[in-house]
Amino acid sequence: MSRPISILGIFVADLTFRTDRMPHQGETVIGNSFKLGPGGKGSNQAIAARRAGAEIMFITKIGKDTFGDIAMKLYADEGINSEFIWEIPKISTGAAAIMVNEQSGENSIIVVPGAADALVPDDLDDAESGIAECSFFMA
């Protein structure tokens, strides 16, 4: 049996807005569609690796909020080890506002890392026992 892969990364809730054109500073435009979904480079890597058949241990911090609940349900549904995903009260889970111009495909993104920004080196010490069991560590 192969050993798991440990991934240190961020989860953000992606809020994607599609529009015919991007607004100018101070302007409001009507959008065509909106989608809420999971995001974050590390989280996306963890999900892709899991779907490819790897056992995954994901390391991050999320808020104890609705977006954090979405993350935990996603990881449970995907079969990702969440032992070292810490839920932090009073700090929100990260979010990204993604505006996509449907004509050109170009986008503009604002990312707020939220609780993941509270990760510190000591957190890796706390996860050391899990990391030691893994064949790879990605950050």
Feature names for model-found ranges:
Residues 27-29, 36, 51-135:
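Conserved N-terminal subdomain of the carbohydrate kinase-like
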Residues 1-61, 68-70:
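Glycine-rich phosphate/adenosyl-contacting loop at the front of the ribokinase-like
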